[in-house]
């Protein structure tokens, strides 16, 4: 069992992406460097920051960075622990997200997930590769997960 959120959990998601190249080929290649920020849901917890590199049909890098570090990414998906945990639990319960828990829905109004980017073209990469990101997170259905903020 892996704990969400943790480096090991996200590395497993990357490994699953790499094992399922054929599924990702359906959406076309994705060359993008991005980050995911887990914002604390209470003052007792600290933020977590993870960096991902997608090259063609694979995840070539997953790193945990210190919060506040310049992640050198195209964009960062920012949301609270509660938002991320609810999305992952929904994906696991339904073998994929219901309409209210898809990345498209959760980012549509910049709430509850905000897409932080330095410019519009970088932010647009999320939309361009949106199906790839959703399929990446759908890999959570194959991870036995313990949720701990």
Name the predicted role of every residue range.
Residues 1-149:
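Feature captures hydrophobic
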């Amino acid at each position: 069992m892996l704990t969400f959120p943790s480096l090991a959990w996200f590395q497993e998601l990357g490994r699953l992406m790499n094992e399922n190249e054929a599924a990702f080929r359906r959406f076309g290649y994705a060359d993008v460097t991005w980050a995911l920020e887990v914002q604390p849901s209470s003052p007792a917890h600290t933020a977590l920051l993870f960096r991902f590199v997608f090259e063609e049909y694979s995840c070539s890098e997953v790193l945990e960075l210190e919060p506040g570090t310049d992640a050198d990414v195209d964009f960062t998906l920012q949301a609270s622990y509660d938002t991320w945990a609810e999305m992952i639990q929904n994906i696991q319960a339904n073998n994929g997200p219901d309409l209210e828990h898809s990345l498209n829905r959760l980012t549509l109004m910049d709430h509850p997930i905000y897409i932080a980017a330095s410019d519009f073209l970088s932010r647009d990469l999320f939309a361009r590769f949106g199906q790839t990101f959703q399929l990446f997170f759908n890999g959570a259905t194959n991870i036995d997960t313990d949720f701990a903020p």
